[in-house]
Amino acid sequence: MTAKLKLLDEDGIYEHLFERYSLLQKHANELKQDLGIVSRSSGDLEVSFEPQPGSHVKEHFNFEIAQSLSSLNSSRDNNNSTTGYVVWSTTPFFLQWLLYSPSGAIFGKGGTIEVEGDASHSAYELPAIFGSRTVDTDESSDVPAAPQHIIVELGAGIAGMLCVALANYVDKYVCTDQKGLLNGLKRNIKHNIDELRLRNMESSTLDFEISRRTALKTELDVLDLDWESFGLKSSNFHTLITPAGPSTVCILSMDVVYNEFLIAPYLRTLKKLLQTYEKSGNTSFAILGIQLRDQDVVEMFLSTAVVQFELKVCAIVDSEIDKTRFGLYYITTQ
């Protein structure tokens, strides 16, 4: 089955969740019945990604990740906000799906996708997540510069897998999370930076850069961004998440929806970013990955996003996703 989008309105949310949780019951014997931590037994993980025959991305990736199980269970670390200290299953699933599945290809490269539930459209034109600008751009040229392709990750945690792998395919990648998690994130990025091998890499926040034999480059940075305080004191964004010119900005979030208290701060941050990027003449959208645990929390998130924050939320419908405990959502402003 080719992937399609299903636009969710207030009534459609209940139908969508009924279908997804029914599929969870159907596949219950094949799925792990846990919270989704990749490993509860080891502080050091090896995670590999291999292309399948016919995959649109041919590169393979091997990561060695240091996580902190003691910090996960601590009541003192990072003001008791500790889920980011370990690796959660949504991230490797999404990366494998985006890079190697036929359904993920349309999101990476852009293109036309069927949509259900929109009375005005039978299909949407998706902007590409991936794209390239060469290192030496002639600034004196009258030809408009090609748009940058940027990923801003909200709630990156300490793993660093998404940023290192996907920085191979975009012009700029900014990982954001709470301050207490950033040192662990930086260490994992540095340890696995050899997996960023298709581009030169520059950074203003990491203590190293890399040079490759290519005209392509990426900027890779790490930024403290707390949803509860974001945008309250100033309407200006940090320069790292402010595009310098016309850009396509993808906001990624993996497994950040797991209790009701985070829903409003996350959605407020997401909407502010999307609206500001659009007002500045950029193309912006978000992809959110959720592990389907408590149905009430997922329902509250989707309802709050659609009704209170008036965001356009589409479920990504794909047979590969249907067989898992994960949900992927494509989100834009109205």
From Swiss-Prot:
Any single biological process term in GO: methylation
Q: Which domain of life is it from?
A: Eukaryota
Q: Per the UniProt record, which EC number(s) apply here? A: 2.1.1.-
Q: Which UniProt keywords apply?
A: Methyltransferase, S-adenosyl-L-methionine, Transferase
The record's Gene Ontology cellular component field reads: cytosol; protein-containing complex
Keyword Chloroplast assigned to the entry: answer is: no
As given in the record, the signal peptide range reads: none
The record's section on InterPro entries has: Methyltransf_16, SAM-dependent_MTases_sf
Name the residues that bind S-adenosyl-L-methionine. W88, G155, A156, G157, D177, W227, M254
Q: Tell me a Gene Ontology molecular-function term this record carries.
A: S-adenosylmethionine-dependent methyltransferase activity
Name of the top EC class for this enzyme: transferase
Its job = S-adenosyl-L-methionine-dependent protein-lysine N-methyltransferase that methylates 60S ribosomal protein L1.
Family membership, please give it.
Belongs to the class I-like SAM-binding methyltransferase superfamily. RKM5 family.
Record-linked PANTHER family: HEPATOCELLULAR CARCINOMA-ASSOCIATED ANTIGEN, RIBOSOMAL LYSINE N-METHYLTRANSFERASE 5
- Name of the protein in its database record: Ribosomal lysine N-methyltransferase 5
User: Gene symbol?
Assistant: RKM5
